[in-house]
Regions:
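Conserved strand-to-loop turn within each blade of WD40 beta-propeller repeats
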Residues: 40-43, 81-83, 119-121, 159-161, ...
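Blade-level signature of beta-propeller repeat domains, shared across WD40, Kelch, NHL, RCC1
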Residues: 318-348
């Protein structure tokens, strides 16, 4: 892997790349936390880098390949998941604990720094950072495709074919089930714990209110949503699934009866990531290699927005991750990792 630095010229201003790197396999997932960035490659190589300069910290393999990576919030641990199982990495001594069970694992989510939920076939397993087992959900109807924590780690949402299940530690059976049709492609939970949202292959965007399990009727809901993410405040939800991106306002009683803002992306969207903070700044990547930055809450409901800034990365963007509000890390299908440093930490 080689690391260099240069500048990126976009519409509106010129921003410096903190660093760029080239890797020899296609990235599939990028995670950033604290002073680290983790890059998971399709061939099974995990690279842990310093966020500030891109210098390597560690490299290790997962023999069955990779689908997902997630750093703990304190950047002291990393979980990676793939077709044959998962692995946990510890920063203090670079120790890797592999659990190659043969069960497909394509999702993981941390609850604080002391617990991580990992998809394991038709179940989700909750572990300590050292790999110690805490509890396991009961099996669902199909393979688990998404996991997310709610209510400060008291609830765990697990998505699979035909349903999203909400679990508490005891019993292993779900305390609530939110049914849908077909395969789930994306799962997002509001930080407030009020909403569960699901993107699906066969039906439009689904939204449930956790208090009573009611499903909201949405106007202009996109179909085939595969990327779905709330901002830090829980007010704004971004979804792909159309030629563009829709942004939904979850303030008050939620988005039922309202229309979303439409972000006019220049090409099919392949990655979405909210900038940390409360200003509703969104980054999107496209299959034409374009990286866009958006003021996603500008204008009015039902209106259309164009990018505030655009950058050309030269190959389809496969993953985005923010390392704080001032550094955006993007990965392309051809193996380029680019860390873009924005000139101001709060404005866009």
């Amino acid at each position: 892997m080689s690391v260099t630095s240069d500048t990126a010229t976009g519409t509106g201003f010129t921003a410096a790349y903190a660093w760029t790197a080239e890797v020899d396999e296609a990235p599939v997932s990028v995670s950033a936390a604290g002073d680290l960035v983790a890059v998971a490659g399709a061939g099974g190589t995990v690279r842990v880098l310093h966020a500030a300069a891109g210098a390597p910290v560690d490299v290790f393999p997962l023999s069955e390949g990779l689908l997902h990576a997630a750093l703990s919030p304190d950047a002291q641990h990393l979980v990676v998941a793939g077709p044959g199982g998962h692995a946990l990495w510890r920063r203090a001594d670079r120790r890797v604990r592999r659990a190659l069970t043969g069960e497909r694992s394509q999702a993981a989510a941390w609850s604080g720094t002391d617990r991580v939920a990992v998809a394991a076939g038709r179940r989700a397993v909750v572990l300590r950072p050292d790999g110690t087992h805490v509890w396991t959900t009961g099996p669902g109807a199909g393979a688990v495709t998404g996991v997310a924590w709610m209510r400060g780690g008291r609830w765990l949402a697990v998505a699979a074919y035909g349903e999203v299940r909400r679990h508490e530690r005891h019993p292993a059976a779900p305390v609530a089930t939110y049914p849908h049709t077909g395969s789930r492609l994306a799962l997002a939970l509001a930080p407030t714990g009020r909403w569960i949202c699901s993107g699906n292959r066969d039906v439009p965007l689904r939204v449930w209110r956790t208090r009573d399990g009611d499903r909201l009727a949405l106007s202009d809901a996109p179909e085939k949503v595969s990327r779905l993410v709330f901002d830090d405040t829980g007010r704004w939800l971004a979804a792909d699934g159309t030629p563009h991106v829709t942004v939904w306002d979850f303030s008050g009683d939620g988005p039922a009866g309202s229309r979303p803002r439409t972000l006019l992306a220049p090409a099919a969207v392949t990655a979405l990531a909210w900038r940390p903070g409360t200003r509703a700044h969104l980054a999107s990547g496209g299959d034409d290699g374009t990286l866009c930055l958006w003021r996603a809450a500008a204008g009015r409901a039902g209106g259309s927005l164009r990018p505030a800034h655009r950058y050309a990365l030269g190959a389809p963007v496969v993953a985005l991750a923010w390392s704080g509000p001032g550094l955006l890390v993007a990965a392309t299908r051809e193996g380029r990792i680019a860390a873009l440093r924005l000139p101001d930490g709060t404005r866009l």
